Amino acid sequence: MSEPMSERERWQLELDKLQRGLQGDPFAFLGPQRDADGEGGVLRAYLPGAQRVELLDEDGATLAELEQSDPGSGLFQHHLERLPARYRLRTHWPDGVQESEDPYAFGPLLGELDLYLFAEGNHRQLASCLGAQLTRHEGVDGVRFAVWAPNAVRVSVVGDFNGWDGRRHPMRRRYPSGVWELFIPRLGAGELYKYELQGHAGLLPLKADPLALACETPPGTASKTCAALRHEWRDQDWLARRAERQGYAAPLSIYEVHAGSWRHRDGRPPRWSELAEELIPYVRQLGFSHIELMPVMEHPFGGSWGYQPLGLFAPTARYGTPEDFAGFVDACHQAGIGVILDWVPAHFPTDAHGLGRFDGTALYEYEHPFEGFHQDWDTYIYNLGRSEVHGFMLASALHWLRTYHVDGLRVDAVASMLYRDYSRKEGEWLPNRHGGRENLEAIDFLHHLNQVVASETPGALVIAEESTAWPGVSRPVAEGGLGFSHKWNMGWMHDSLAYIGEDPLHRRYHHHQLTFGLLYAFSEHFILPISHDEVVHGKHSLLDKMPGDRWQKFANLRLYLSFMWSHPGKKLLFMGCEFGQWREWNHDGELDWYLLRYPEHQGVQDLVATLNRLYHELPALHARDGEALGFEWLIGDDQANSVYAWLRHAAGEPSLLAVHNFTPVPRQGYRIGVPQGGDWDVLLNSDAQAYAGSGAGSQGRVASEPAGAHGQAQSLLLELPPLGTLLLRPAG
């Protein structure tokens, strides 16, 4: 049997752990260590590089000087007959003197309920629990750090405040949660920090805080201490009416924006305050109801457009502070504009400072690459079957909805979440526990997400970008659906863009591409999306997709937008499409605003403003977007002339007639049946000179005739403009 270690041998062993960065239980050795009698004891501080350390009472009087155990060891200690209840350390460094309370004199920080809820995956306020929280603890101001790393041997907080030395601030492990915590007194806002983790296989790259509330401006990758948001909100009226404004019967017209490339200031991306000054009035002028921001969560690579985020709780520092972002959202609401954020729970990038192999193991991601690595995007896939990861992502969603008052989340890449074999060949994926291809863990998460959002942030939207035929995406969970409020209609987008890209001479052979979408238009609560994805990577801008010469391109664009706005479904249009930008979108530049000097571009912009005005003013265009009763075909079979016509209905409101001519041939005397006799007003002619069109087609008022057509007793004899749309309703 070996001899028991002497006291010196024991602390030499502990010192060796500290010096080698292997001390996983610093509170058992550092700070006040009481003698067996409970009165006196040893007070230890490990401060490598310090020259002297004085022990002060709470009033600042010197009680003793701590002795360095061995010269240069960095371990300072002193035995006292009575350990003080409160004390401070005055540390003499080569470049100055620092006075502060001892981090290792404080008791545990997080409560058992917090740790239980986190482990359960149901801590709804995780953003105020883990991460770096400015707080007052045991009467002392400072920052409480907490991070989940259950498989780490040791975790330390490092930053400018300790010279990025991982030996200075090792953290306390809380069993069994795997959370590490430490309170650093007198630390404030604006400090850069990361976590240094010792894994079982050695030291890991410094990690940013997964729950950081603010981050360093890229290309820097550090987290930043940040006070809890103290914005004085003035959007109470908006929030009180939000559920009504965002209901299925309300008009929803979304302007999709990449904040950094909408409009530059002095050759640089804008700040949130500048966007509030310029973007909000612009959106109001054009009549959009909402702004959808491409991801503003902190992301290391600007070229990902935000779709590879690592700071799931922090607005990117590229455009300002968290307070600046809150001010932007508040200003939108006061102007009557909703804010939707793109949010990415499907995958995350492999940057060394990020979530991947966070504690030396596959913590946030699946272990097996067939489950945990996305080959198309070179990213990791969240293991949403792990309760802590499930709860982390749920808390992120709630953080944006509650803390920043955003009105909805557009969930990116839902299809990749639903299927284990998404974009994988045979033999490159693992089946679920039933042998199927569905990702049951992700489905459970989406169910939970949508139920919690509906319960805790009533009226908020959760929109799915989902490109497959998965049934019931926007059906309530209780009815067997995924529970989203809306789904992007990717099928409509692909078919309609393919059709409009055809030469008008050939469109008769593709007539079904516009009629097919109306077979399933009411199976979900759809949004018609013309998003950023359609104007990049060689796909051409929306204007440049149009066939023909310059005149035909603009006429086709005006026709396409008019077709879209009169079609069932809410609307989404990416910035630049509203005035017909020629070039593809470039995230490093700004939109080509100079084009608005030309009448054709100004005409497209004016048309979009008119379409939004009509869409909001006329219930027939929005009140029954998701109901078959709100739509009635009149002409869906005029393949020879590429003409389509339908009625839109709303209860107790006049019907609206939409007629589209997809050829450059004016159609004189084109008869269309209508449900009501008398005069009909032409509300819109997309070829009107007001929109830089040719001025052809019916204008003003048209009288009906008692000649039956298309199953209606009355009809109108119209002049259809070339490559144009007419919108009409009964006069009066």
From Swiss-Prot:
Organism the protein comes from: Pseudomonas paraeruginosa (strain DSM 24068 / PA7)
Presence of the UniProt keyword Transferase in the record: yes
Gene Ontology MF term list: 1,4-alpha-glucan branching enzyme activity; cation binding; hydrolase activity, hydrolyzing O-glycosyl compounds
Top-level division of the source organism's lineage: Bacteria
Protein purpose: Catalyzes the formation of the alpha-1,6-glucosidic linkages in glycogen by scission of a 1,4-alpha-linked oligosaccharide from growing alpha-1,4-glucan chains and the subsequent attachment of the oligosaccharide to the alpha-1,6 position.
EC code: 2.4.1.18
Reaction(s) catalysed by this chain's protein: Transfers a segment of a (1->4)-alpha-D-glucan chain to a primary hydroxy group in a similar glucan chain
Protein name (record): 1,4-alpha-glucan branching enzyme GlgB
Calcium is among the record's keywords: no
